[in-house]
């Protein structure tokens, strides 16, 4: 029996009568992607070991040896010298095996009162907590870039659209502030998600807890968790916190995708509202004149990638009975890639927005088309006593006449306007034309949330204060 205890094999191999096949080893191993968790795995193990020593479950000398060994392993990992082994399955057993090789039996005592089930759940939460904080910072950087651009263009007039048809004049600054609002809600979702991530699973062991006199609250305090997972079965089995983060990330990417669609449209020569810096574009291998907006196009495409990860994680969880199942090994790659995709995209977009070249004249020329001030004419009539529905009908008839002539409402003389609006001619005075200018239109929307330059600047100031 003694010889069997010292026989080399997997951490659980004593139960089995034959070794795992090489094909199954490759199929079930996760070390070449979950090694990303190595540093948080060490952090969690050190907190666990300190608690074991404080509770007299392991000796103080064992703790000292574990701390010394882990410091060496951390250095090896950071220097790229650590040798990851497929035969050891995952990040946890690779580190434990190296620790035991360095310090002997003390390394074997580290796993007392712990399972890989609660260990990996702790690792993921520790890692994801840090990534949420990083993404929150990147969302702040993007919003800051948008606010800078919005402030510079508080009075730059462009057409506002509904159904991709010219609707009413707005300012470019106001348009950009819409995305600031979206990304602000994204940041709030990340903060809210973090609250549920920041709970300690360690101590749940495999599923039922442990018979050792552990102190979960001490470990939670050491690792900076807000509290512990209240139920051991739930602690090791559910990945709803990862799903919630991925859902929040999918919304970030959805907002990025909407913005990307507009950047691509605005940069098109047929629109020409903006230009992107060359470093964010590519050329064509056959057409020498091309400058393609590859970054926003690729971000638009990567949104589908993150959406796919969300569906993958939801599908992963939906059929699992309690408690832990091997299915959960598949949670990491979608989660890791979601973090990478969102973080890289936000970082690139913050820099890209700062380098946007705005073409105010092209925006203004476009806003002069499509009868963008027709609603202002209707409002003019309403303010002189006409019911809005009657004003709407009268202006719509005038628009139809102008469309047939190929002119704008502002191109009509006062006499022509009174003629086309004969039923309400008595309400139309010389001042009507001030309502039909682009500047007059945007200036009239002077209320919180409106597009007036004054309101845009106030909104920028408020948003900057909120970011502090």
Swiss-Prot record:
Annotated localization: Cytoplasm
Alphabetized UniProt keyword annotations: Amino-acid biosynthesis, Arginine biosynthesis, Cytoplasm, Lyase
GO molecular function, one term: argininosuccinate lyase activity
Class of the enzyme per the UniProt entry, highest EC level: lyase
Alphabetized Pfam families for the sequence: ASL_C2, Lyase_1
Pathway: Amino-acid biosynthesis; L-arginine biosynthesis; L-arginine from L-ornithine and carbamoyl phosphate: step 3/3
Known catalytic reactions: 2-(N(omega)-L-arginino)succinate = fumarate + L-arginine
Keyword Cytoplasm tagged: yes
EC number(s) stated in the UniProt entry for this protein: 4.3.2.1
GO biological process terms held by the UniProt record: arginine biosynthetic process via ornithine; L-arginine biosynthetic process
Family to which this protein belongs: Belongs to the lyase 1 family. Argininosuccinate lyase subfamily.
Protein name, as recorded: Argininosuccinate lyase
Organism: Paraburkholderia xenovorans (strain LB400)
